Amino acid sequence: LESRGLGDVYKRQILILMKFFLENFKWLLACSLMYFSSCFGQTFFISLYANEIRSFFQLSHGDWGSIYALGTLASAFMMLVLGGLVDKHEFKKLLILVFISLSILCFTMVLNSSLWILIGIIFGLRFFGQGMLFHLPSVAIGRWFGQNKGKATSISVLGFSLGEAIFPIIMTFIISFVGWKFSWSFGGVLLLLILPFIVTLLKVERTPKSSRNQVIEQTGLNDKHLSLIHI
């Protein structure tokens, strides 16, 4: 009896989750694609090129590690400084800026032969990819889903898990055909293809429905506040 009761609970939870997903498909898919696109600035993705970058720029393991650490620390500092922009500026405009910037960085990697520019590229990939493209959907979920943000996050973050699973295979295949430098153009093109799709999905931003007319104040980066309404 206990087993049957537990099974009924699981079924009910699955049905609730499916209903939630279908009702909020556009916004959940948009956030999932943002998490997916952040992969181009994540460590697991950039590390696919570690040996090729070290060989091309004649770097030791220590040199490359220092460059990567510097770019990561600098991007983390910039997130503290600029992370609050999402609270002050229109979400879609900021999203477009981040996507285009990350795409340009991917194309720049194709053409680059300067060590100094490489340092800037690594910083940019970490800031716009690992930083902003993970920050934006996280803030959006808090703004759009209120008390259901945990449920929304658990669904949307699957986009990142998908990228983490497929990109190593896809990029290894592409690198074997076109070389490591030109393979970065795949990222630049893919980002430009995903962007208009997300913008279309977010043509109308989700407005949480208030059942109690209560407002929660959520503090984000830079001590900015987001008004979140109970659903």
Protein language model regions, located:
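Single conserved hydrophobic/aromatic residue that forms the stacking wall/gate
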Residues: 1-13, 229-230
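Extracytoplasmic
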Residues: 27-52, 57-61
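Residue-level signature of mid-helix packing/kink "hotspots" within the transmembrane helices
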Residues: 72-80, 165
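Conserved MFS/SLC helix-loop-helix module at the cytosolic interface between two early adjacent transmembrane helices
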Residues: 77-110
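Hydrophobic core of transmembrane alpha-helices in multi-pass small-molecule transporters
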Residues: 116-132
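Intracellular juxtamembrane helix-capping segments at the cytosolic ends
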Residues: 132-145
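Glycine-rich segments within core transmembrane alpha-helices of 12-TM secondary carriers
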Residues: 149-168
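Symmetry-related core transmembrane helices of the 12-TM Major Facilitator Superfamily/SLC fold
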Residues: 184-200
